[in-house]
């Protein structure tokens, strides 16, 4: 009930890592993390659906090392946070946020991209084999998420990279 009424615990700062991945990869992430660590040394939890409230309390007490969630859950939590200011994922600062299949946020105007960029973290990783799928601007959201300045500023990115690239500027073509 507290999930619906905005009474989730607030996390100021955590040493936990948040992994955001497509739903189809959540179990694989958990399996790989557990396989790569000694038994009992790493607490890994999936954060989606009905278990979110239980895991929110566990996280608020520092009883988990890695939370794995989907882009769908991230966007749902972001919407909730925007409406009520109540969301575990957005209530504090993570030690590390990892986006798997990070090209998922390629369109900066999508809720998933805005949500990913809004997460607070000491460290940020973006994992993708295709940082540019269709347009050079696909790269912008990744740079913004990673907080690579000044490239994470859309005006700077467009002025010094996207527009010169579109006009076939030789120097920019060499950079890209």
Regions found by a protein language model. Give the residues of each.
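SF2 helicase/translocase NTPase motor core
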Residues: 1-99, 106-107, 161-167
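Conserved P-loop NTPase motor "coupling/switch" region that bridges the ATPase
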Residues: 96, 104, 113-176
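Short alpha-helix within the catalytic core of nucleotide-sugar-dependent glycosyltransferases
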Residues: 110
């Amino acid at each position: 009930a507290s999930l619906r009424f905005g009474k989730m615990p607030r996390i100021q700062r955590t040493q936990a890592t948040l992994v955001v991945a497509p739903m189809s990869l959540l179990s694989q992430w958990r399996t790989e993390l557990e396989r790569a660590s000694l038994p009992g040394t790493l607490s890994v939890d999936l954060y989606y659906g009905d278990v979110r409230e239980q895991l929110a309390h566990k996280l608020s007490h520092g009883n988990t090392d890695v939370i794995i969630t989907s882009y769908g859950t991230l966007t749902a939590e972001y919407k909730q946070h925007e409406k009520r200011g109540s969301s575990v994922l957005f209530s504090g600062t993570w030690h590390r946020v990892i986006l798997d299949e990070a090209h998922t946020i390629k369109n900066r105007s999508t809720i998933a991209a805005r949500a990913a960029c809004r997460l607070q973290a000491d460290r940020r990783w973006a994992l993708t084999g295709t940082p540019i799928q269709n347009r050079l601007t696909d790269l912008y959201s990744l740079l913004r998420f990673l907080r690579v300045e000044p490239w994470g500023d859309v005006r700077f990115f467009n002025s010094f990279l996207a527009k010169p690239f579109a006009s076939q500027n030789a120097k920019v073509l060499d950079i890209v």
